[in-house]
UniProtKB/Swiss-Prot annotation:
Any one cellular-component term (Gene Ontology): chloroplast thylakoid membrane
Species: Physcomitrium patens (Spreading-leaved earth moss)
Protein name: Photosystem II D2 protein
Top-level enzyme category: oxidoreductase
Transmembrane segments: 41-61, 125-141, 153-166, 208-228, 279-295
Catalytic activity, as annotated: 2 a plastoquinone + 4 hnu + 2 H2O = 2 a plastoquinol + O2
Upper lineage: Eukaryota, Viridiplantae, Streptophyta, Embryophyta, Bryophyta
E.C. numbers: 1.10.3.9
Pfam families tied to this protein: Photo_RC
Main location: plastid
Subunit structure: PSII is composed of 1 copy each of membrane proteins PsbA, PsbB, PsbC, PsbD, PsbE, PsbF, PsbH, PsbI, PsbJ, PsbK, PsbL, PsbM, PsbT, PsbX, PsbY, PsbZ, Psb30/Ycf12, at least 3 peripheral proteins of the oxygen-evolving complex and a large number of cofactors. It forms dimeric complexes.
Residues in the signal sequence: none
Length: 353
């Protein structure tokens, strides 16, 4: 028997190694180095949103009521963007605008920048969490790569778009009805639905939903009998460790339905990853274009002909008129700081008015 005589290998751990051991320890909820970014930012972002929707008015920024305290409900409450006069100020609590006054900070819209910036870093922290966990259990990082899609959309809509405009005022406020208002704004002022990047985004998201439904149904349809007898919900109580569904049967079925079918599971699942993530990225790229006020398709020849010929109209020209109506109504209501006043005869009227 050989006895090794020498210095003990157990040296005292440094601060970094001790922190690494604690952060990456196996526990019910993994923390990790990414958790140092994720958990505080997510906590502050959600806390700011709950605080704002419960107590904080938008009277000073938008001339609106936006909190439960003022009578709003879950669908109409929001954390509103700062006033347009504040441009792209970070609105730090200790900054020159609020000067440490918390009430004044809330009135100025400071909670919006607080929620938006902490929310963006929380999403980035969540993506890093997926990278970190994948590395620790020796998985490839496709989950984290896929999550780049939602991050790209959030950053482009809530941060890049208002940075390209005159201020945070033109970003979406954080609320359900507020997001609907923002969608109408995008349509009226940017003709967003005719933008090819929006079309690619819709194709990606709805296509992914279709793929998900088809894939789930096909796997359920081709589950192997596992000896327990027929059970519609066999997926919930599997008793076999090996592969549970037949790719060959699924391939045969869809070959007969469409004439083509996936023959490789890896290609099938990569396609299910590729379609929604690409759609989200295309939407994000389109919103960056809108930040720079790039136009969607303009079919000027149809507009000119419609102006000259009362009998000529297309769905495009009708939509252009609808957009003009949105702008006429929205500009005065949505941008009170501009003091816009339109003559009554130029405003579209509905039956209720």
């Amino acid at each position: 028997m050989t006895i090794a005589i020498g210095k003990s290998s157990k040296e005292p751990k440094g601060l970094f190694d001790s922190m690494d051991d604690w952060l990456r320890r196996d526990r019910f909820v993994f923390v990790g180095w990414s958790g140092l970014l994720l958990f505080p930012c997510a906590y502050f972002s959600l806390g700011g949103w709950f605080t704002g929707t419960t107590f904080v008015t938008s009277w000073y920024t938008h001339g609106l009521a936006s909190s439960y305290l003022e009578g709003c409900n879950f669908l109409t409450a929001a954390v509103s963007t700062p006033a347009n006069s504040l441009a792209h100020s970070l609105l730090l609590l200790w900054g020159p605008e609020a000067q440490g006054d918390f009430t004044r900070w809330c009135q100025l819209g400071g909670l919006w920048t607080f929620v938006a910036l902490h929310g963006a870093f929380a999403l980035i922290g969540f993506m890093l969490r997926q990278f970190e966990l994948a590395r620790s259990v020796q998985l490839r990082p496709y989950n984290a790569i896929a999550f780049s899609g939602p991050i790209a959309v959030f950053v482009s809509v809530f941060l890049i778009y208002p940075l390209g405009q005159s201020g945070w005022f033109f970003a979406p406020s954080f609320g359900v009805a507020a997001i609907f208002r923002f969608i109408l704004f995008f349509q009226g002022f940017h003709n967003w639905t005719l933008n090819p990047f929006h079309m690619m985004g819709v194709a990606g998201v709805l296509g992914a939903a279709l793929l998900c439904a088809i894939h789930g149904a096909t796997v359920e349809n081709t589950l192997f009998e596992d000896g327990d007898g027929a059970n519609t919900f066999r997926a919930f109580n599997p008793t076999q460790s090996e592969e549970t569904y037949s790719m060959v049967t699924a391939n045969r079925f869809w070959s007969q339905i469409f004439g083509v079918a996936f023959s490789n599971k890896r290609w099938l699942h990569f396609f299910m990853l590729f379609v929604p993530v690409t759609g989200l990225w295309m939407s994000a790229i389109g919103v960056v274009g809108l930040a720079l006020n790039l136009r969607a398709y303009d079919f000027v020849s149809q507009e000119i002909r419609a102006a000259e010929d009362p009998e000529f109209e297309t769905f495009y020209t009708k939509n252009i008129l609808l957009n003009e109506g949105i702008r006429a109504w929205m500009a005065a209501q949505d941008q009170p700081h501009e003091n816009l006043v339109f003559p009554e005869e130029v405003l579209p009227r509905g039956n209720a008015l």
